Amino acid sequence: MTTSVKPKRKSLGTLAFSQAVNGYQLFNSSRELDIRSKVMLHANGDWGDLAPEDAETNNQVVRRSNGGRLHSVYKLQDNKTIWIISSGYGLTKDDMDLTQFSEQDYCNTVILFPEEY
């Protein structure tokens, strides 16, 4: 597990589960809790099974909080791998000039299986 800086947490924005992840956890509270625990790790700066250089890139994004991308990789209890990707980390709609960007351009987080990328 790759650890990171302990930043002041920012919002992960809107959470979206891919169709496959949503189906995987549907009607299975153990799987749902496992995935949600990984989202909390991601939110707290634990990047999971990332290479050290990728973890450092995430740490730099957290320190700057200016709209970068965070990527985490985790193994679930049944050994399936999920990715959690936050785009626009640290941005809020108040930071955006909505004449140039839409609200979808500020922070959002997607939980997906690698094969869905």
PLM ranges: what are they?
Residues M1-T3, T92-K93:
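Low-complexity, charged, repeat-rich alpha-helical/coil interaction segments
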Residues T2-H71:
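Compact soluble domain cores
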Residues N66-Y117:
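Short, compact, well-ordered microdomains
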